[in-house]
Design a protein with these regions (language model features):
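Conserved ABC ATPase "signature" region
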Residues: 43-60
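Conserved ABC ATPase signature
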Residues: 62-66, 70
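Catalytic Walker B motif of ABC-type/P-loop ATPase nucleotide-binding domains
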Residues: 87-91
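ABC ATPase nucleotide-binding domains
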Residues: 154, 161-192
């Protein structure tokens, strides 16, 4: 940054989910072994994560037989095992069909709602990003624009990169979780 101050929480735990991994078909590794290898964990945490991600039925399967959607869920579970403060997702819905993408983004929303966690997601799925995030940061060799999805869709730099048609086609809506803000005053979707 050119100005300001960057503050980092002491002992910040980061969970990282890559967009994919190369699985060697001849290497026998179960889902449970993959999730827990090189991770300090307890059985309760493991059981909670596989339940939350809905992969209990996969734990004894070999990685090599998983579908694309199953593998994405396994990668997500692995990134959540140590209860991170920050979850970094690199193209988490890549190679999923549209229903798989919607299901996966819904799961990410549920994780965000249930956990005290920040999520940084890299994605090229503009439509899904614009409807499922609170803040968008648009990069093209520099920060082109950032803000709430509604603001970004109307930003001149966004429009110059993607065109007016794309900005007008964006199905942008704002979802606000009112249940967690009972004691504060909610005005125009923001706590004031």
């Amino acid at each position: 940054p050119n100005f300001g101050k960057i503050q980092k929480k002491d002992k910040l735990k980061i969970g990282y989910m890559p967009q994919s991994i190369n699985v060697i078909n001849t290497m026998p590794m179960t889902v449970k072994n993959f999730i827990t290898v090189r991770k300090k964990y307890d059985d309760i945490s493991f059981k909670q994560v596989i339940s939350e991600i809905d992969i209990k039925h996969l734990v004894d399967k070999q990685l090599s037989v998983l579908s694309g959607g199953e593998m994405q869920r396994v990668l997500l579970a692995r990134s959540l095992l140590n209860n991170p403060d920050l979850l970094v997702l690199d193209e988490p819905a890549q190679n999923l069909d549209i229903s798989g993408q919607l299901s996966f983004y819904k799961l990410i929303q549920e994780i965000y709602s249930k956990r005290d966690i920040s999520i940084l997601m890299v994605s090229h799925d503009l439509h899904l990003v614009m409807v499922s995030t609170k803040k968008v940061l648009c990069l093209s060799n520099h920060i082109c624009c950032s803000g709430k999805p509604q603001q970004v869709a109307q930003d001149p730099e966004f429009i110059s990169m993607f065109g007016k048609d794309m900005a007008n086609m964006m199905a942008v809506y704002q979802h606000t979780n009112h249940t967690s803000q009972i004691d504060n005053h909610l005005i125009d979707g923001e706590i004031k």
